[in-house]
From Swiss-Prot:
Protein name, entry field: Small ribosomal subunit protein bS18c
GO terms for biological process, alphabetical: translation
InterPro entries linked: Ribosomal_bS18, Ribosomal_bS18_CS, Ribosomal_bS18_sf
Alphabetized UniProt keyword annotations: Chloroplast, Plastid, Ribonucleoprotein, Ribosomal protein, RNA-binding, rRNA-binding
Organism: Gossypium barbadense
Subcellular location: Plastid, Chloroplast
Length: 101
């Protein structure tokens, strides 16, 4: 190879493969809350397959398990963190009103 061509070659960096999110021993079940909660966003939405890095079959089973857990009220349909923020702000305003009087 010429010297001029050798300048443009980049060395290939090694990368570490990520472990699969679901091991072979894990059971995808609506009662397995520690497993299911990994695949839900902070807002309570089911994360996409691309984000989860799951196979199609695993994603389908996770989705069904999450929906069953929601129906049985093991999981909330929505995370209502915004309501808590609003309630805190209303308590602050009422506290300020009482101070001013």
């Amino acid at each position: 190879m010429d010297k001029s061509k050798r300048l443009f070659l980049k060395s290939k960096r090694s990368f570490r493969r990520r472990l699969p999110p679901i091991q072979s021993g894990d059971r995808i079940d609506y009662r397995n809350m520690s497993l299911i909660s990994r695949f839900i966003s902070e807002q309570g939405k089911i994360l996409s397959r691309r984000v989860n890095r799951l196979t199609l079959k695993q994603q389908r089973l996770i989705t069904i398990a999450i929906k069953q857990a929601r129906i049985l009220s093991l999981l909330p349909f929505l995370n209502n963190e915004k309501q808590f923020e609003r309630s805190e702000s209303t308590t602050r305003t009422t506290a300020l009103r009482t101070r001013n009087k």
